[in-house]
Amino acid sequence: KGFEEGDFEMMTDGTEERQFLYAEDCCEALETIMENYTDFKPEDPLHITSFHATSIKEVAAIIMGQFNLIGKPIKINPGLAKDSVQMDKRNEANSYIMDWWLPQTNMQDGIKAVFDEMKKEYGY
């Protein structure tokens, strides 16, 4: 939305936290589980995360920083609503995976990679 319209409103106040995971890291985690964890059954819950909680406000700040770097400053305005989707529920990461795998892409690098692809799409 920032490429097309500039400033925009967040759906919530941004205080809620999530554990984000770069898609390539998720794929590597799934491959690692398939190769190493023979006790895993299809009905077992699987929670793969970055093991690091980040607020939506922090994500917005990183995105604004990417726009600033291309000379297109935007403002992301927090909404008034509180989180009504997950209501601050947590999915606990399965720590057994840490024996074989840890995410390789931090939040800033992941956002930058996606942003770089979007820049191409929007002609920046």
Predicted regions, residues:
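C-terminal substrate-binding subdomain of Rossmann-fold SDR/epimerase-dehydratase oxidoreductases
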Residues: F3-Y124
